[in-house]
Amino acid sequence: FPAAAALIQAFGWRGALVFIGAVLLVGVAPLHAWALRGPALASTARGADEKADATLHEALRQRSFWLLTLCFMLYAFASAALWAHVMPAFAAKGLSEAQALAVLVWIGPAQVAGRFVYAWAGRGVSLRLLGLFVLLGMPASLALFALSTQLWPLFGFALLFGVANGLVTIARGGLVPQYFGR
């Protein structure tokens, strides 16, 4: 956030978006492609594990598919709505841009910390329980944000929102194959 704020101040929001997009395109996309590179999958007959995988047509007929889709869609909607309105919301609380950034900068580290804690200690936690934590953690963080009238509780919002937002990627990436196969 501080870097984005500095880019916006220096180049305006359009210029900042162009710069960020260029960094993603030139720097992040090639790294991502390199990291995902692996041995080509050999064309083999369907194995015993693959027979249990649901086809797209089968998945679309399952209630669990639509419930997961709805949960992840609403989560994404709430997250996007937060990012669209977070700075005006801080301003409405009477807080400066610097104070807002001091809080928001903790979301990223909390995302990473949540993933590390899960990788280290959460392997015994079912993906369903993880998903439940995520789907309760995000609205709880938003309630904390809405009800906070002081600066310090907003750090709790940032940490809880960050952890939930970091863990949603694990829940989303794990629940779909668990329910429908790969």
Language-model-derived ranges and their functions:
Residues 31, 141-145, 161:
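MFS-fold secondary transporters
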Residues 152-160:
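Paired small-residue
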Residues 1-40:
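Helix-loop-helix hairpin linking two adjacent transmembrane segments in secondary transporters
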Residues 126, 147-149:
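Helix-breaking motifs and short loop linkers at transmembrane-helix boundaries and internal kinks
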Residues 1, 167-180:
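Intracellular juxtamembrane helix-capping segments at the cytosolic ends
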Residues 35-54:
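Flexible cytoplasmic inter-helical loops of multi-pass small-molecule transporters
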